[in-house]
Every structure is written in structure tokens, then in C-alpha cells.
Amino acid sequence: MKQELIERFTRYVKIDTQSNEESHTVPTTPGQIEFGKLLVEELKEIGLSEVTMDEKGYVMATLPANTDKDVPVIGFLAHLDTATDFTGKNVKPQIHENFDGNAITLNEELNVVLTPEQFPELPSYKGHTIITTDGTTLLGADDKAGLTEIMVAMNYLIHNPQIKHGKIRVAFTPDEEIGRGPSHFDVEAFGASFAYTMDGGPLGGLEYESFNAASAKLTFRGTNTHPGTAKNKMRNASKLAMEFDRQLPVEEAPEYTEGYEGFYHLLSLNGDVEQSKAYYIIRDFDRNHFEARKNNIKDIVKNMQEKYGEDAIVLEMNDQYYNMLEKIEPVREIVDIAYEAMKSLNIEPNIHPIRGGTDGSQLSYMGLPTPNIFTGGENYHGKFEYVSVDTMEKAVQVIVEIARRFEEQA
């Protein structure tokens, strides 16, 4: 199993599948279509049925039941794309067998070193086989580790028919990293009662709480005149943006928050005297606090409009996704089965809120309750990203055990 994980994963990460927020096509990049087509062929080779890829790049497949019991249809999902935060082109995965727990020089020429001082969890992987970058790209373990694990788990179940299971549906979605993964996902066609995203991090991760999320785009309009004669005439749009930001609580930003704490996050700010644009995201686990944050932004805008004129600021605010907990609680048994599966494999479940979102956040509100499970990756979205193959193997075992337990309890 370990060799299959390494072979598939290292092959998959070499395909550039970064999504593109500026694109309006679905999927947003051609690499995702290329990858999807490859997976369609490999799913067929493994022996899955009903293998499809639609024109928008959504891949679906079925592992038929091998039991006469009436078992709920369960699904496993991962996403095709990788993050936009750092380049994912020409990924050169580096395999480190029997890792000694010490610093790894990823790139001598560029002096890129993965150190325990910077990443304290690193020594805990001593003895593992880990896969790193070469220091020039991200790795793409988010989410090609999860995708690989699903492929290997399906292959394992087909070759071990003594493990009884109900019908299993598999799906690989595009554009998750830019929040569009479920936008064109056909829940009815997928046909599962519930599902699990394989899109978590270190060993034991089991997540079923996510942020409530919104975006706020602000356009500040100024009046430009010659600075020598600007008194009582100039209105500086960039300074309006700065004035707006100063009215948000300084300590309620990502760099000062953790756990269940929400935040405002200024993603980008650019402009000049004539016009300036600021793009924020708003996050909170508590729905009331989430609404209060959005109202705070609206109030600041209203007060500044009264001061500078209604045309001085334009606000566009949109909800992105909601805390999946509300939709998971009524079917709590899907979390319990995953929890029990981990415990039976001597994995200590690490239940914590997702300080972000997964496809499951949106899918849960589309009628497909979908918690999230670990994949074995660390330091996602950058050159220090790595994955433990040993933990990937554990994730495969969890998928298999979840399928077995649903059949056993039917």
C-alpha cells in the first residue's frame, strides 16, 4: 500500500492544477480538466463503475455494494485543484525515507531549509517516510494526498472482497481553493446520504465545525486635484481606505486569533488618490457574532458616507458559506462512526473547528452532510509543505474502516 501511495501521489502532484480566482470558466484552469481525465481512466482501471466527468470537470464514480444489507450510500470527496498562494508549476516531490527528525535542506542553492525550530511538529515524524517540495513550489498535498488516499482505498476494497461494504460514491471537485468547489456539484446525481471530505491535516483530524464566511469588497472614490492647490478640494481615496480599516478592531485579525475566535481579514488593498479598493473576508463560528461583524462593516460605511458623501464608498458584501455544524448535528452518527473507526485503529481523534472551509461546508447546506478527515499533510500552501506517507496509510485505513462499520451496523 505504501508504494502505491507514493507512486500515485508523486505522479499526481506533478500535474499543475492550481485554480485561478480571476477566471470565469469552470473549472478555472485547464490543468484540472487534464487531471480529471487521467483520474477517470484510473478509476476505470481500478474497477469502479459509473465513472463520469462532466463538462465542468466534476468526476464521479461508484464502488458497488458487496453485501445484501440495506446500507446507506456514503461518499468520499477530494478536490482537484491546488492553492493559489504559491506556485504549483513544475512540482518536484522529494522522498525522505526513515526520516531522522532533523532539519531538511530543501534547496541548497536558495538556502531553503525545513527546520524543527520553525516547524516544531517536524521531529514527531521521525521514522516516517515523508515527501517534501524542492523549495521552489508548494507540494499540493492539499488535496492530492486526500485524492490519492481515496483512490488507494477503493483499490484496496476491490482487492479485499472479504471486507463487506455498501455502495460507495467517490467525487473529485474543481476550484475548491477559491471557494467554488460545490458551485456546480450535483448532489442528486451523486446520490449519497452523506459524505466525508478527505481534506484535513495531521493524523487524527476530524472536523465538523467550520467558519461562517462572507466577503466584503469596498470601493473608495476620491477627488484628485493638484496637491499645491488641494485645500478643501481633494478627497484622497487611499486615505479613506486607511480610515475605514482603522475602525476595525486591531486584535480581531487572523494574526491575533485562534480556536473559536473570529476575525476580519484585509486580503488586498490597492489604489491611488482617485480610487482605492479593499477586499476583506469576515469569519466567525457563531452565527450571531458573524452577523454582528457584517453589521459593523455596514455601520462604518454608513458613518463614513454621512461624513464624505454617499458616493465616497461603495460596499459589496456576500455570504460565502456557513458553519456546517448546524447540518451535521442531526446526523451526528456519521461523526461517531468516523470517531470509532479511528479509535479502533489506535488513532486518537483530534476534534477541532476548521479555521477555514472545505467543500463540505457548502455541501452540508446543499443536503449532503459532509465532515472532514485528516490526510497527513502539514504547512499547506507553501514551499515548506510536506506529507507523511505513514499518515496517508492510516487515512486509507480509516476510509476502509468507515465503509466496513456502516455495513456492520446496518
From Swiss-Prot:
It is an enzyme of class 3 (hydrolase). Zn(2+) 2 binds at D142, E177, H381. The active site is at D81, E176. GO terms for cellular component: cytosol. CDD domains: M20_peptT. Binds 2 Zn(2+) ions per subunit. Its main location: cytoplasm. It is found in: Cytoplasm. Cleaves the N-terminal amino acid of tripeptides. This is Peptidase T.
